[in-house]
Amino acid sequence: MRYIRLCIISLLATLPLAVHASPQPLEQIKQSESQLSGSVGMIEMDLASGRTLTAWRADERFPMMSTFKVVLCGAVLARVDAGDEQLERKIHYRQQDLVDYSPVSEKHLADGMTVGELCAAAITMSDNSAANLLLATVGGPAGLTAFLRQIGDNVTRLDRWETELNEALPGDARDTTTPASMAATLRKLLTSQRLSARSQRQLLQWMVDDRVAGPLIRSVLPAGWFIADKTGAAERGARGIVALLGPNNKAERIVVIYLRDTPASMAERNQQIAGIGAALIEHWQR
């Protein structure tokens, strides 16, 4: 009988670990900062109401990296809605227009790409030349920043083109945002009248089709969960993701996670972001 009681006690002692294998989100973020020897910025926002559910360094500046490409394509779609652009318009470019990491655009030097194809390449494959070609259509970095101001984002700024914008110097405000500002801007693009319903669906679909985000939150996503995302990476340990997430294949919340100033490898950075994502998912109903 004593042996049975000891077995039951031992089993009960393991139950909390089985129920909650991941720490609470803020505890996970603190652990990640310690393990990365860097800074983590994060916000979890309810998509419908805009209410902040979890935040850590949410008002501190972090390099945007390639996450800016979602906002860029939002600006392109706003021009489409206004009748100033067409997704079917073909853009031709030359070899000298290509920059590092252009896996899609480098294959279309002969025939060019449509505006819609460039947006798909910029978001789903993070094609840098596609982003630069699109930036030119909205007035460059200054034009994109002006668009952000027009929709009420007074924080996010783009100052340079790909690939210089990924320098990520400590304390440099250029090409930065805050988790809170990025989440609010993404919510405006996807839920307000800043974009037509058709353009909102298109922007979201490009994020659903992201093909370079596998090692991050997608790696810990349970079956039946929805995700649409865009990642970014830069020098000096910068890494980031903007995502829409939710169970029952429904986008319920916006999650923005940025890392900066860490000596960690790319694999380690990916692992920490995945860990934060796992904590959010496990404690979704907190």
UniProtKB/Swiss-Prot annotation:
InterPro entries: Beta-lactam/transpept-like, Beta-lactam_cat, Beta-lactam_class-A, Beta-lactam_class-A_AS. Disulfide bonds join C73-C119. It catalyses: a beta-lactam + H2O = a substituted beta-amino acid. The active site is at S66, E164. It is an enzyme of class 3 (hydrolase). Keywords: Antibiotic resistance, Disulfide bond, Hydrolase, Signal. GO terms for molecular function: beta-lactamase activity. It holds the Pfam family Beta-lactamase2. Residues 1-21 form the signal peptide. One of its GO terms (biological process) is beta-lactam antibiotic catabolic process. Substrate binds at K230, T231, G232. It comes from the Bacteria. Its EC number is 3.5.2.6. Belongs to the class-A beta-lactamase family. The class A beta-lactamase family has a specific amino-acid numbering system, sometimes called Ambler or ABL numbering and often misspelt as Amber. A multiple sequence alignment was used to derive a consensus sequence and then the consensus was numbered taking into account insertions and deletions. This allows use of identical numbers, e.g. for active site residues, despite differences in protein length. UniProt always uses natural numbering of residues, hence there appear to be differences in numbering between this entry and some papers. NCBIfam families: bla_class_A, SHV, SHV_LEN_OKP. This is Beta-lactamase SHV-29. It comes from Klebsiella pneumoniae. The gene is bla.
